[in-house]
């Protein structure tokens, strides 16, 4: 069992069933590393969360979230994360309509009672002193309407406020008579046979699109045109007074069929420029992308099975050589086999089937890395990757190459890690025909990675092993390279953590043929 615990304490008006008292219904963690016996302020509404870092209720992080009478978060106090032992506090302020108008940066508090509520004025003074800044907060302003939209946002820092540097927003509709608010309409047709035509068809009628205008601290403006369904039609960036437009053209189902880039709009819309600068998409009858084209490249086509899983794909280079790339999944939808084949992309007799695979009873008598494939006939398969899950029956395909090395970990592995990737085989592209790299992944009783054994292109084996703290952080990582000449090189990484499970120190050492070559730490660099 993985040793992780999180306790939550909700403090407000509690209605307890008969026979249950507050003492038996609530569990309060006894202490954390820096702040013993932490509880929230009893005169406030709060939620207390304790996250253990070592599987016990002695060491960890306590977070108390305070709320007002309407359940709105007003203050968050965290204990056990600061190396000095002080609390970390943050404030949130709302207006009468419950909109967040100010958020303060997280900073250290001088509060003497761990995780106790800090009065608003006191917390503000402490945060300004901590950051040595009169404005360590972000301000937001809204329209006066109850559902008012955001009008301005000013980032933290007194310097920004002195310069009135803020990000501003305003809202309008498209209008051809106004600068930067006009937009074009297009005639377009992207067909299933991959023929297409796109042309400009004049200006959009005024009021067709809603426009949100954002202006940052440097005066740069962004115009976003959306239709009545909230779908983006045009994104316009104003650069030195010039418009850089990106149009998103959609079909009647709201699916994007073309993206017209700023370079295309600058060069002019014709067939050659569309080929060079536009993104194009085609959909099948089930609204899945059946073909796509990126600027300057050929078409890429996709075919799916009855479970809507991608089974075949082909790019322009594959089309020239007459091959396709295939993907086969198991019954849980996990990708098991990837490779190339000589099937035609137009051959979709299998598309009404659920294409899947399962481990064969006789693993060595299958061309699919130990799997039997169902629902499709693959012609001349060439495997690129094979994944194995849930167990280690596949190991008989690879002899002793991927055997678990217990001497490296000192413990046994979980024999049936359900839902985990347990092995992988990858082809070496450009190497000897049939060459591949095989891997086995072993897990401990908590399903944490315990050891990876992998062959390499030099004919040797790499063994990566892990040891963990009680809180599931990596304490030791060791990589051993076993070479064909019988020698070995090893790397070792040691980690220590603070009470909040953050890396405190990291130590690295390297050995070759039993001799230590160098030794480093993350803070002291070279040690010996």
Protein language model regions, located:
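Beta-strand elements of repeat-based all-beta scaffolds
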Residues: 22-528
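Bacterial Sec-dependent N-terminal signal peptides
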Residues: 1-27
């Amino acid at each position: 069992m993985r040793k992780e615990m999180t306790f939550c304490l909700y403090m407000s008006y509690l209605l307890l069933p008969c026979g249950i008292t507050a003492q038996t219904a609530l569990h309060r963690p006894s202490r954390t590393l820096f702040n013993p016996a932490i509880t929230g302020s009893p005169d406030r509404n709060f939620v207390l969360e304790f996250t253990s870092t070592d599987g016990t209720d002695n060491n960890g992080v306590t977070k108390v979230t305070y709320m007002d009478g309407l359940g709105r978060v007003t203050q968050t106090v965290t204990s056990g994360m600061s190396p000095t032992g002080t609390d970390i506090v943050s404030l949130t302020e709302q207006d009468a309509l419950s909109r967040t108008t100010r958020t303060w940066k997280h900073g250290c508090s001088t509060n003497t009672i761990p995780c106790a509520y800090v009065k608003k004025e006191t917390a503000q003074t402490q945060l300004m002193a901590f950051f040595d800044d009169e404005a360590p907060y972000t301000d937001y302003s809204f329209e006066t309407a109850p559902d008012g939209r955001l009008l301005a946002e000013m980032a933290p820092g007194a310097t920004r406020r002195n310069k009135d540097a803020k990000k501003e927003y305003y809202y309008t509709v498209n209008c051809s008579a106004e600068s930067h608010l006009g937009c074009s309409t297009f005639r377009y047709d992207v067909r299933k046979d991959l023929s297409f035509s796109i042309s400009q068809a004049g200006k959009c009628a005024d009021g067709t699109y809603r426009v949100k205008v954002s202006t940052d601290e440097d005066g740069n403006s962004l115009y976003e045109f959306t239709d009545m369904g909230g779908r983006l039609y045009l994104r316009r960036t104003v650069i030195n007074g010039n418009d850089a437009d990106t149009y998103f053209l959609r079909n009647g189902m709201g699916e994007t069929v073309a993206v017209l880039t700023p370079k295309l709009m600058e060069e002019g819309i014709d067939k050659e420029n569309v080929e060079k600068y536009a993104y194009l998409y085609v959909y099948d009858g089930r609204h899945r992308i059946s073909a796509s084209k990126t600027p300057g490249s050929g078409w890429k086509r996709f075919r799916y099975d009855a479970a809507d899983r991608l089974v075949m794909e082909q790019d322009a280079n594959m089309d020239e050589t007459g091959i396709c790339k295939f993907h086969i999944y198991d019954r849980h939808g996990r990708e098991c086999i990837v490779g190339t084949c000589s099937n035609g992309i137009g051959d979709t007799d299998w598309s009404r089937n659920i294409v899947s695979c399962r481990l064969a009873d006789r693993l060595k008598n299958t061309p699919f890395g130990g799997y039997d494939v169902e629902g499709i006939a693959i012609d001349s398969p060439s495997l690129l990757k094979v994944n194995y899950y849930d167990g280690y029956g596949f190991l008989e395909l690879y002899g002793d190459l991927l055997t678990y090395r217990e001497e490296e970990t000192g413990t046994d592995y979980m024999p049936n890690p359900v839902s985990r990737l347990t092995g992988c085989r990858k082809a070496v592209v450009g190497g000897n025909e049939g060459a591949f790299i095989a891997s086995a992944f072993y897990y401990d009783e908590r399903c944490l990675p315990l050891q990876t054994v992998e062959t390499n292109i030099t004919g040797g084996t790499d063994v990566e092993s892990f040891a963990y703290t009680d809180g599931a952080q990596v304490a030791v990582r060791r990589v051993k390279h076993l070479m064909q000449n019988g020698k070995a090189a090893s790397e070792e990484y040691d980690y220590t953590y603070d009470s909040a499970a953050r890396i405190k120190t990291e130590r690295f050492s390297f050995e070759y043929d039993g001799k230590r070559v160098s030794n480093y730490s993350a803070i002291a660099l070279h040690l010996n």
